[in-house]
């Protein structure tokens, strides 16, 4: 009985504390729906379609509003103007990484994606500089992507035109590009260690987008005390880091300071220069987390986009025909596509942009946070407040993209058929926290897709009108439904 009384007392205190905090904060923050104690507005959100819920709230409360996901307030920015004003015009103030409890437990504030403050700035600066040294944006990295594109084609030829699920083949190509940058070598697509590595990355992407993960992320107590798929993320990341640690040991044994071969070498040299001390942001642990971040961010996003692109091309064969006609005219059959071709292929460029716009891969972006107290549009947002930016509301803005729910490369073409840029195109986010690998990802999408379409006719197992392109998961990421197709050599 005593234990029951204590439990009731504790819950009552939490209830009253929640009421007090919410009432005192809500007067200063942007408007929003009235939250319930402890759980906040969570029951008013569809965890299977968070971006849709945010759109509905914006119709009532405007482009800047507050939600309580649990007991903490989160400010939501909806629409191009609000997102641009925050992430670009006030980029420094909105450059923090917001609350993401599962990742915080795994990464412990390390790495390039979920770190903050000076650690994030130093790690990001070093990573960008090293990627440039390794050829990012230069011909050398393009050579690697072209080489991998040919390996991808050879692997697809082995299917002999039979039905296949392209998930793992399309995942191997971008992963191998990252492998060549991180530890200099690529893997055979049938390598057992490589396939296990790929499987862990793919499983984590699915779990991150599950409704249960959204629940755990908003109620962190569940992470430690409840069973569920979220524990698989920790196990998978520990496996990936263990694998990477072995690579780091191999690099330490063969390191030549005068001739760095890859990202790991550059980082180990940084440590040898005496920068690894109690105050330094550089450490072996941060290296392992940073490399793990680069793999997670650089593999699954690109492979999912490729997978979705092929599904959309199957659904819209007239688009596929136009792209292949342009490839025949500009590239031909006797050489490999290169990045110089892109400026002469407006329809293909528009198709790839439209794929990224239409699929809306990361609908609510990774959470941001304000780095200081800030007055934003006459509202007061305290330092550390989590900020959600709805990329869906930008990529599917009907004023910029007429009929935004329709897949149409014409969204990125002018009346003369020339490629047309749009400030609303931000699948890689924007501002200080925008994707560090945007240039590489765009290169991979162009070279992999054009090389596939140069060499194969895509054949669906069902009629195009029966192909469903609705994402099966729409939490953290929009993932396409599973499907099979035939790659018919041409």
Curated annotation (Swiss-Prot):
Top-rank EC class of the record's enzyme: oxidoreductase
Keywords: Endoplasmic reticulum, Heme, Iron, Membrane, Metal-binding, Microsome, Monooxygenase, Oxidoreductase
Binding site for heme: 435
EC identifiers of the protein: 1.14.14.1
Reaction it catalyzes: an organic molecule + reduced [NADPH--hemoprotein reductase] + O2 = an alcohol + oxidized [NADPH--hemoprotein reductase] + H2O + H(+)
Gene encoding the protein: CYP2C26
GO MF terms, alphabetically ordered: heme binding; iron ion binding; oxidoreductase activity, acting on paired donors, with incorporation or reduction of molecular oxygen, reduced flavin or flavoprotein as one donor, and incorporation of one atom of oxygen
Name by which UniProt lists this protein: Cytochrome P450 2C26
